[in-house]
Design a protein with these regions (language model features):
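Conserved catalytic-core segment of nucleotide-activated headgroup transferases in glycan assembly
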Residues: 1-34
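Short alpha-helical segment that forms part of, or immediately flanks, the ligand-binding pocket
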Residues: 41, 64-68, 79-83
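Short alpha-helical donor nucleotide-sugar binding micro-motif in glycosyltransferases
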Residues: 42-47
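Aromatic "clamp/platform" in nucleotide-sugar-dependent glycosyltransferases that forms part
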Residues: 55
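Short hydrophobic beta-strand element within catalytic cores of glycosyltransferases
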Residues: 72-75
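Conserved acidic donor-binding segment of nucleotide-sugar-dependent glycosyltransferases
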Residues: 89-97, 104-114
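A charged, aromatic-enriched C-terminal amphipathic alpha-helix characteristic of glycosyltransferases
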Residues: 114-149
Length: 150
């Protein structure tokens, strides 16, 4: 599906240094690969990163799920994404080399850590919860209504 921008991911992967590209094993979870909740968490905890280059859809749950599982997220810097995804995880949507550089950095950190499963990152869970909890959504709606009535 074009809005997922898998062609962009292919451009990033084919632009990686060979020694990094040889270590990369892509898993496209979604329409073709269905996982239970437990399998999804395990896959994310064993993944080097979640790449989320989409530029034409609203907020996506995969980054929130990945962050909750402790998986690093690399996402396109767009308004729908930057409401929840921390700035350090956002890259220019069309800059292949910025994505290549970030994948190389994440891969190096993964290798230094011995490729062990990741643990949930409490700071990212708190970040997502603060953005997506019913209380946070209620405050955002109240603010939007207040602004609309001014």
């Amino acid at each position: 599906e074009p809005r997922k921008r898998l062609d962009f991911v292919r451009d990033v992967i084919t632009s990686l240094p060979e020694e990094v590209a040889q270590d990369i094993h892509m898993l496209h979870i979604g329409s073709e690969v269905k996982l239970s909740d437990e399998q999804l968490v395990a896959a994310l905890q064993h993944a080097e990163a979640l790449l989320f280059p989409s530029i034409s859809e609203g907020f996506g749950y995969p980054p929130a799920e990945a962050m909750a599982a402790g998986c690093p997220v690399i996402a396109a810097n767009l308004p729908a994404h930057n409401e929840v995804i921390p700035e350090r995880c956002l890259l220019p949507a069309t800059d292949v080399m910025a994505w290549v550089d970030e994948v190389v950095k994440v891969h190096a950190a993964w290798k230094r850590a011995g490729g062990v499963p990741r643990n949930p990152d409490d700071s990212l869970i708190e970040h997502v919860t603060a953005s997506l909890s019913p209380e946070a959504q209620g405050k955002a709606m109240a603010k939007a209504f207040d602004n609309a009535c001014e």
